[in-house]
């Protein structure tokens, strides 16, 4: 099926843990709690394995996210790359393990700080305000407004506003907060927030709140939209005047390939918007693989209802592949690898981001 090795591997999506058969050749079983990638060399019947794994994990196991394995030249053994600290595992071969952040999750460029939103091509599409606070020296720490470069104090940005606070480098913490007008109270809120969340203030960013009603994840391989994971209907359970910030996901289906899925009246608008962004990103000249989450506004105070906006961007290597055409994605990725034999370790030129709802 593929001219070079590629294997699809599952990870638990709705549960915290799961046992997954990874390699039938060695009957390798292990507990997986974070994304894991598997690499086969051509010596391991790679074409048959790739096709079988694709069908097994993409089509038969429900409730799992799927990650893509990739080819490595001059290798004859399994290799695994993990995100996070997986405490225990059992293997029956001498496969090496790399703990922590894999090397293929490199920044787009040296100054990007592993965040796509700082890239000029993406900044133009962020239509909400986000402040990144770089110093916790005192309660008046200065943040930078993304897109304008304007400096702002914590109090100025939050006084009397509803803000979304999240961990900048991941998904470990997020909360919507209604801030009062009093600066001294805002100071206390952030002091408590840092203490109870366990996250150092520089690892948090503060954003204006958006209420999306439809969301679609577009999967991009080599600057081309290959498939999508849409139409996600987002509902915010209300508590008084506040949104909980949690999505009620009603449906997953591939808007690019499902002819019967017509429920999303905004899909064409969202796709054209995503394509416009992808075209701008392709001007970097890099072969980029990433996911782009696009949603529709439900708040005239932010923008006209029906206006698309960027919710989140992530590298393809650490994204949930919910509901997309996994075979189309795998095939596109395999073809890209054949077209770019000069790719170094990991073979996956990825971009990462902390732009989130």
Regions found by a protein language model. Name each.
Residues 169, 208-210, 296-298, 314-317:
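Short, flexible loop/turn elements at secondary-structure junctions
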Residues 199, 236-305, 334-343, 347-357:
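A long amphipathic alpha-helix within ATP-dependent nucleotide-binding catalytic cores
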């Amino acid at each position: 099926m593929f001219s070079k090795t590629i294997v699809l591997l599952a990870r638990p999506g709705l549960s915290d843990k799961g046992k997954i058969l990874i390699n039938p050749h060695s009957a390798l079983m292990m507990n997986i709690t974070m994304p894991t990638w598997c690499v086969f060399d051509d010596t391991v019947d790679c074409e048959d394995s790739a096709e079988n794994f694709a069908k097994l994990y993409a089509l038969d196991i429900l409730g799992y996210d799927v990650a893509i394995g990739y080819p490595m030249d001059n290798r004859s053994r399994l290799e695994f790359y993990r995100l996070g600290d997986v405490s225990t595992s059992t293997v029956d071969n001498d496969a090496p393990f790399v703990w922590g952040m894999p090397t293929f999750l490199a920044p787009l460029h040296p100054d990007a700080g592993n965040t796509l939103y700082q890239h000029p091509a993406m900044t133009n599409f962020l239509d909400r305000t986000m402040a990144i606070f770089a110093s916790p020296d005192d309660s008046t720490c200065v943040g930078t407004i993304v897109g304008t470069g304007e400096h702002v104090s914590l109090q100025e940005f939050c006084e009397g506003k509803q803000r979304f606070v999240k961990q900048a480098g991941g998904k470990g913490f997020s909360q919507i907060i209604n801030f009062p007008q009093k600066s001294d109270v805002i100071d206390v809120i952030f002091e408590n927030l840092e203490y109870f969340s366990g996250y150092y203030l520089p690892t948090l960013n503060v954003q204006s709140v958006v209420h999306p009603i439809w969301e679609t994840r577009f999967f991009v391989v080599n600057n081309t939209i290959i498939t999508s994971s849409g139409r996600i209907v987002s509902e915010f359970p209300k508590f008084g005047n506040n949104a909980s910030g949690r999505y009620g996901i009603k449906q997953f289906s591939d808007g690019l390939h499902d002819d019967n899925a017509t429920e999303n009246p905004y899909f064409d608008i969202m796709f054209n918007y995503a394509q416009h962004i992808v075209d701008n990103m392709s001007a970097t000249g890099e072969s980029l693989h990433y996911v782009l989450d696009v949603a529709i506004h439900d708040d005239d105070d932010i923008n006209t209802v029906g206006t698309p906006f960027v919710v989140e961007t992530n590298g393809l290597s650490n994204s949930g592949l919910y509901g997309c055409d996994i075979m189309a994605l795998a095939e596109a990725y395999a073809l890209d690898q054949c077209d770019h034999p000069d790719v170094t370790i990991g073979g996956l030129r990825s971009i990462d981001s902390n732009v989130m709802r």
